Amino acid sequence: MKLNFLSKILMLINLVLLTLQLFLMDTFWDFYHYPFLNLMVPVIALINVIFFVFWIIKFKWPFLLFIFSVLIGFKEWGKLYKFPNNAIPISSGIKVMSFNVRLFNSFEWIDSKSVPQSIESFVNKESPDLVCLQEYSKEFSPKFKNYPHQYIASSKKNGQNGLCILSKYPLLNRGRLDFEDSNNSALYADFFYKKDSIRIYNVHLESLRINLKDTLFTQEHSQKFIERIQSVVEKQELQIDRFDKVEKKNNYPTIICTDLNNNAFSRVYKRLKDNRLDAFMLSGNGLGATYKLAYFPFRIDFIFTDQKFKVINFKTHDIKLSDHKPISALLEWK
């Protein structure tokens, strides 16, 4: 059908947003000059989906623009959404979980006194072989008695905002990566599986520190907001540099559990993932959102694995025991 003047304007806006999304998703080449825009890819994608539905309802040809963009950037769209995998997962393999537990609700963000016990019950029920916890608190943590091997470390003397690796396998060589001028850090530990040595990392990168008081409705506030995002991302890049120095000395295949505090369209994601597998992209379901940023769902928690693993199953657990959702992956050693 022929487009009127208003429809032509809307089509132009839609075309610009679709093109911008493809560039920001790294469809053609690296495009990380504006970290704030990379962070906003899910929002831009939602607007484009709304446009698509609008054109379908109006029965106008610009709905094809969205279809073409999906075909062009099919792989990158997979970072946003995965259709259900109906394959029946095998029961054997290494099951890994990553969960930012937000200090076990020590400041009572959730109106419940039993959050630590509920987290322990959830972990015991899922029974992963290895668990990586971020924002760990020694004071409020349950004992996790089902996990005889535990590695706990914090950059703070009071044990707050620490990291923890829980394991059913003995943890051998262990270490902590302190990040300069930050309360965040990373841990690693090696373990044996089927006579092979494997390394697991628990990585917690610098927080974006976005809250509901942030606004983009004035030039002054929006400029400060964007500058803060830029500053935090630069700090995250330095933390990846620190990680790379340690990882270069490692000869074992790796599993990385991380609260990245950034999304799958950032250079931070690309650098930490490197040539590893993103477990969600291989066996995830739906949006896979793990965190709500100003009420908008984002996927900022990840499990990356060496290519010597086969990702059998991946799950984002829909429970409300923290401001993050836990994720888990079942991995088969090839």
Regions found by a protein language model. Name each.
Residues 1-144, 334:
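N-terminal, active-site-proximal structural segment of metallo-dependent hydrolase catalytic domains
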Residues 6-55, 61-65, 245-254, 260-334:
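Metal-dependent phosphoester-hydrolase catalytic domains
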Residues 143-146, 214, 267-270:
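Short amphipathic alpha-helical segments
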Residues 71-90, 117-121, 130-211, 315-318:
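Structured beta-strand-rich core segments of catalytic domains in phosphoester-bond hydrolases
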Residues 107-113, 177-178, 291-294, 317:
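Short, solvent-exposed loop/turn segments at secondary-structure boundaries
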Residues 103-107, 137-141, 157-160, 183, ...:
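Active-site environment of divalent metal-dependent phosphoester hydrolases
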Residues 37, 95-101, 115-140, 189, ...:
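Active-site beta-strand/loop signature of hydrolases that rely on acidic residues for catalysis
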Residues 101-114, 209-232:
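Acidic/histidine-rich helix-loop elements
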